[in-house]
């Protein structure tokens, strides 16, 4: 379970379905590919179509990460803070639906952050905020990466906090938005030039 995020996700994680309420996750192959890629590698960039279940995948990956690690900080960012907090809300719902023996004790349970007794934290915010500046980040997840404005300035401010560790992880997921920073990251990954694993979800 600790070493297999796919088994953990399909066995224990539930998500809210519009018609059926809480339902177990049944992962598609590409979701399994993303889970495996970010578990086995440090940097993954996912070029995805809309409504492709990327948020569900992120919920599964992050929940597994904070349950089975100690003293890790996850930064969950999006170009809009509300979008990041919505993903955090989904993680909270999935966490509350876990069996009691899998849950960690909760220290902090706020709108924009959670902290557990194993020392793990999740911070949600916009890429334009100072939410994670100066913090030591173990896992950086950016949703809709292609739509982040002032990318160079933003990434220059956060990269030192994630490059200092030997096991830190970065996960980008986004729909395309022209030939910008996300496009360049994806191309670099495809050409094996930047250390990212590239996954495309048509």
Regions flagged by a language model, labelled:
Residues 1-202:
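Phosphate/NTP-binding elements of NTP-utilizing enzymes
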């Amino acid at each position: 379970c600790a070493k297999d995020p796919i088994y953990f996700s399909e066995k224990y994680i539930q998500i809210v379905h519009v018609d059926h309420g809480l339902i177990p996750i049944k992962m598609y192959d590409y979701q399994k590919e993303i889970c495996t890629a970010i578990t086995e590698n440090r940097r993954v960039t996912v070029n995805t179509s809309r409504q492709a279940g990327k948020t569900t995948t992120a919920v599964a990956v992050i929940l597994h990460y904070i349950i089975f690690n100690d003293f890790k900080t996850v930064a969950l960012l999006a170009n809009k803070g509300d979008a990041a907090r919505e993903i955090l809300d989904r993680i909270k719902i999935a966490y509350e639906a876990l069996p009691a023996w899998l849950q960690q004790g909760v220290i902090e349970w706020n709108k924009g952050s959670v902290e557990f007794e194993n020392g793990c934290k999740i911070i949600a915010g916009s890429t334009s905020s100072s939410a994670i500046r100066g913090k030591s980040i173990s896992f950086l997840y950016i949703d809709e990466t292609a739509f982040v404005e002032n990318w160079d300035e933003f990434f220059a401010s956060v990269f030192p906090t994630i490059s200092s560790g030997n096991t830190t992880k970065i996960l980008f997921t986004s729909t395309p938005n022209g030939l910008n920073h996300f496009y360049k990251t994806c191309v670099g990954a495809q050409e094996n030039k930047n250390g990212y694993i590239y996954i495309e979800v048509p």
